[in-house]
């Protein structure tokens, strides 16, 4: 039997919105497998949908640069929001972004090695750890960028108007699509969601044959919700992003979105202590 820790219960609660006791029970039944617990909770109706793993917790900045036929996003992390606004920290982050632009295709390992001496000196001066965490490139005929308070960075590649692509970049920042078009959703993702929807229908009392027919409509809705062109456009929810792009004769070929601290968990001692009481004190 896997150990059900407070941090595991906390993560499941944040991803599903379910209560602590429900989350602990689901984890026990799934032997500590959080993804299986989420699937089981969705099938039983305890959770309508689960957020993707990776809570935004670390501080830092996202910087963007545009070159000839490509763009690059760089994430640099620190421990506090105060340091994220420090001139020395921002100066180093901008140096890193400029280097990434001038040396297309550079890896995170190369960036770390290139700036290690300056990073270490700044850590010693400020007294707070920091690191260059991610670098991602995007090629395209036209590249548009959008930065939301230096915390979220988006690059959109496409054909047509740079102005229209920037509007789409703002949409990507707000709506977090995972794919460009509904047909781009991988077969594995579709099969997994289809089975969950079938089980939900069967558990509600529908015969298997009817459940399988019902799922087709739900799957079309699902692939639309996770794809850029299938989502309702944030600037005009009456139409999809795909319809909007057609109306302005613009096409999106790809995009990337980075948010500061994705996948890094900040310790929240008060909440963890609360959960620990339920799980018997395991952290």
UniProtKB/Swiss-Prot annotation:
Keywords: Cytoplasm, Elongation factor, Protein biosynthesis. InterPro entries: EF-Ts_dimer_sf, Transl_elong_EFTs/EF1B, Transl_elong_EFTs/EF1B_dimer, Transl_elong_Ts_CS, UBA-like_sf. It comes from the Bacteria. The keyword Glycoprotein does not apply. One of its GO terms (cellular component) is cytoplasm. It is found in: Cytoplasm. It holds the Pfam family EF_TS. GO terms for molecular function: translation elongation factor activity. SUPFAM superfamilies: Elongation factor Ts (EF-Ts), dimerisation domain (SSF54713), UBA-like (SSF46934). Residues 80-83 are annotated as: Involved in Mg(2+) ion dislocation from EF-Tu. Belongs to the EF-Ts family. Associates with the EF-Tu.GDP complex and induces the exchange of GDP to GTP. It remains bound to the aminoacyl-tRNA.EF-Tu.GTP complex up to the GTP hydrolysis stage on the ribosome. NCBIfam families: tsf. This is Elongation factor Ts. The lineage of its organism: Bacteria, Pseudomonadati, Pseudomonadota, Gammaproteobacteria, Pasteurellales.
């Amino acid at each position: 039997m896997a150990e059900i820790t407070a941090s595991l219960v906390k993560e499941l609660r944040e991803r599903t919105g379910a209560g602590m006791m429900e989350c602990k029970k689901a984890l026990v039944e799934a032997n500590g497998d959080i993804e299986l617990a989420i699937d089981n909770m969705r099938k039983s109706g305890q959770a309508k949908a689960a957020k993707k793993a990776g809570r935004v917790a670390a501080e830092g900045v996202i910087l963007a640069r545009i070159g000839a036929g490509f763009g690059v996003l760089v994430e640099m992390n620190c421990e506090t929001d105060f340091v994220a606004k420090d001139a020395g920290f921002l100066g180093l982050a901008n140096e890193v972004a400029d280097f990434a632009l001038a040396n297309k295709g550079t890896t995170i390992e190369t960036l770390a090695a290139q700036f290690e001496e300056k990073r270490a000196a700044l850590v010693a001066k400020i007294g707070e750890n920091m690191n260059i965490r991610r670098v991602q490139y995007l090629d395209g005929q036209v590249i548009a960028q959008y930065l939301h308070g230096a915390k979220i960075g988006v690059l959109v590649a496409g054909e047509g108007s740079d102005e229209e692509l920037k509007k789409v970049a703002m949409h990507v920042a707000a709506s977090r699509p995972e794919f460009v078009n509904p047909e781009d959703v991988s077969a594995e993702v579709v099969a997994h969601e289809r089975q969950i929807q079938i089980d939900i229908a069967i558990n509600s009392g529908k015969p298997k044959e009817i459940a399988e027919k019902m799922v087709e409509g739900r799957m079309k809705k699902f692939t639309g919700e996770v794809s850029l062109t299938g989502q309702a456009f944030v600037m005009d929810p009456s139409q999809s992003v795909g319809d909007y792009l057609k109306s302005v004769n613009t096409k999106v070929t790809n995009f990337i979105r980075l948010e500061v601290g994705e996948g890094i968990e900040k310790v929240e001692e008060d909440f963890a202590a609360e959960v620990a009481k339920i799980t018997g004190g395991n952290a």
